[in-house]
Amino acid sequence: SLIQALIGSILLLALPLWKKAHGEESIQAEKKMKVLPISQTLRIPGALMTCLLFLTFCAIEVICGGWSATYMVEAKHMPANLAARATMYFYLGMALGRFLSGVAAKKLTPWQIIFISMGILGVSQTTLLVSGNNVLTMAALLMTGLGVGPLYPNFNYMTPLHFGKDVSQSVMGMQMTFASIGTIAAPALCGVLGQLLGMGIFPAYLMIFYVLTAVGIIALRRTLRQVGRLQQ
């Protein structure tokens, strides 16, 4: 309960930091929004790719939150109470990642924060994949939360910058749709694969979504650069 209270406090403290860093820009840049049909929204250069990114990194969040304890118990033979604590470390890391992202937004660009986050995620996923030590595995879960936490707010913030404020509402709507698909389908598939192959597949399954996220970021930046909308 103490850790849960700490997570809640960190998230509440992060909100004003984001408002201070980006709120004034959003207010000054308000324009009349266009509501586009789905097909037209997804034809905007880079829109489909950013939606797929929301699917993959939101999937990482929910897979870790939903299946890490089961993995620790079944594959690592950890006591259930320690496995639950390991999952709590993941959520603590995610809350801390979003808080630090709000602090860093005053000095770093969203892309710089994303690159740092992906680096942390890469280290954590590799550690999960190769570590046979329970302490290192728990540390890797904390780092996974720390790395994935900043992705959602930073990609969300960049949507009007990359696609135009007039159509950003439509793009954000699709991003939320794809995020919902990721949060529902990815953990369900993990459960099915876990029953068939054993929960030892958990680190490899997470690594697949990390690689998809990394490839998606490269593809998105390339597309945005080609159309002259890439924000540095």
Locate predicted features.
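A late C-terminal transmembrane helix in Major Facilitator Superfamily
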Residues: F163-M199
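Extracytoplasmic gate region of multi-pass secondary transporters
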Residues: P45-M88
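Juxtamembrane intracellular "pre-TM" segments in multi-pass secondary transporters
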Residues: K19-T50
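Helix-to-loop junctions at the C-terminal end of transmembrane segments
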Residues: G97-T109, G194-Q195
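Symmetry-related core transmembrane helices of the 12-TM Major Facilitator Superfamily/SLC fold
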Residues: S1-P16, P203-A219
